Amino acid sequence: GPLTSASAAIIEGLGPQDRLLTVNLARRNTRIAAFLPPEEAFRNVERCLRRAAEIASGQGLAFRRLVVSWVQGQADARTPHRLYRDQLGRLVDELAAALALVTEGQGQLVFCLSQTTATYYIGRRGVSLAQLELAKARAGQVILAGPEYMLERSDGVHLKPRSAVRLGALHGRAIRRVLAGAE
């Protein structure tokens, strides 16, 4: 699936001292607000961060990097542009703060997203514009893997399986480039 294809692309760029732990916190048809604190999805992320730090420590490693592959936006197609941008920025800030807690301020957050095709009204793309603006404003921390317009959807919203795998690979390659210092 998409997580496997993303992981495969990321692993190609890891060094011998690096490890990759992947966690799927997918929530189908969920608006961005459900991922913000104090909601359960964010508490799950906090638990995963603590566990990742424990696993790394148990192996004599340091947990220092959180990479988020953010594939969301269709559920927020009607969310006003500025509101979505503000919520997305808040999510990035909250994730960075949660990471800082478990890494004693030594962590690095890379937030990778792909530009959704979500539209509202005729041709209005507030979510995709907000995603682009945040990536420009926070270059290096927030990265765009690319647009999603070329991926096939089964019902206009959900990706077909083959397209989901392609999206995972798109994210994985973008993340690998950033981790290698190419961006």
Where are these regions (language model features)?
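Cell-envelope and extracellular/periplasmic
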Residues: 1-183
